[in-house]
């Protein structure tokens, strides 16, 4: 009952938070949640809408930014969003705790061998040398209950720590994670691009552990839409998924323009982005934004094995026809 009550309160808050952006023409408008970083296809749609044949013509998007995937899950469950960026864990928590029914229609990024893996950093002079040394410390995470917390909890447990009792976990957005660490507000904090590259260039921090140590080939973020919205508006959602597909292709085909687009959205200098974006040391991206359902199933299975979720079948998230790539 405690979980359900928390979800009811959260869904009410999510609905109230973005009630002001309710669409005037629901049949032609999709309310979409987004976050940073690593949603290049959506950033292209936001910043270069004229590049898309349907966007702004046959349908519109009302964009709402969130700090992470968990609040967007709550907004989807509350009916306050139609589609949004999700992580496998946050989406699954919405199904279990919020009675959310949704389809995975596209995928944004995943961790590839040799590429970037989200990691936790400490100061160079910190006495923290191992995960076990985090006991009693204040640790920052982008969003509590978000996609990174699953493998994070697994790594803590493997080191003999209880994630609920042995550390103080606080929310620190990726954009301010470096400042929080350098100012001593946290003892360790998670790092994502481009903020990791910026911190590494300045020096004075070091990597403690990365998520790939717990779960290789993580599917970090995907695009999900409420099932009832998809079922009622199949042509509208198809147009949206076609543009997600097109956006991914544009992002990969024109790196120079993608650097400009991402810089505009993230407010990050192009020279910083140029050190990693769409290079071998970045996340992986499917060229057609196709969801890797087998990889997502493996993640759900691991979460079930560790007691974080009940057993779930990824098939419930797959629409028979509305899924990237769509032409």
Language-model features: where?
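Bacterial N-terminal signal peptides that target proteins for export
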Residues: 1-11
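Short, glycine-/small- and polar/acidic-enriched structural segments
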Residues: 28-161, 168-171, 187-193, 217
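Conserved C-terminal helix/tail region of periplasmic/extracytoplasmic solute-binding proteins
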Residues: 300-327
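Soluble non-cytosolic domains of exported or imported proteins
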Residues: 66-70, 85, 142, 146-147, ...
């Amino acid at each position: 009952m405690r979980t359900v009550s928390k979800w009811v309160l959260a869904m009410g808050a999510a609905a109230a938070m973005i009630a002001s952006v309710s669409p005037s023409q629901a049949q032609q408008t999709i309310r979409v949640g987004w976050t940073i970083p690593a949603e290049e296809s959506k950033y292209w749609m936001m910043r270069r809408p004229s590049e898309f044949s349907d966007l702004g013509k046959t349908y519109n998007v009302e964009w709402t930014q969130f700090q992470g995937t968990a609040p967007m899950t709550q907004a989807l469950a509350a009916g306050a969003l139609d589609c949004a960026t999700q992580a496998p864990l946050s989406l699954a928590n919405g199904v279990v705790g919020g009675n959310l029914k949704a389809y995975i229609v596209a995928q944004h990024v995943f961790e590839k061998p040799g590429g970037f893996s989200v990691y936790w950093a400490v100061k160079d002079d910190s006495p923290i040398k191992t995960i076990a040394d985090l006991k009693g410390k204040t640790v920052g995470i982008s969003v509590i209950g978000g996609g990174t917390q699953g493998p994070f909890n697994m790594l803590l447990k493997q080191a003999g720590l209880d994630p609920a009792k042995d550390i103080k976990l606080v929310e620190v957005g990726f954009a301010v994670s470096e400042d929080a660490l350098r100012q001593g507000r946290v003892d360790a904090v998670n790092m994502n691009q481009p903020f990791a590259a910026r911190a590494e260039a300045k020096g004075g921090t070091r990597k403690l552990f990365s998520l790939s140590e717990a779960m290789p080939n993580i599917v970090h973020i995907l695009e999900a839409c409420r099932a009832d919205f998809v079922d009622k508006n199949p042509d509208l959602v198809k147009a949206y998924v076609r543009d997600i597909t097109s956006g991914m292709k544009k992002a990969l085909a024109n790196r120079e323009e993608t650097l400009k687009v991402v810089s505009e959205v993230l407010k990050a200098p192009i020279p910083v982005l140029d050190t990693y974006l769409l290079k071998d040391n970045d996340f992986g991206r499917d060229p057609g934004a196709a969801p890797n359902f087998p990889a997502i199933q493996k993640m759900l299975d691991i979460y079930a094995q560790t007691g974080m979720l009940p057993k779930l079948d990824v098939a419930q998230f797959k629409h028979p026809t509305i899924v990237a790539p769509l032409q």
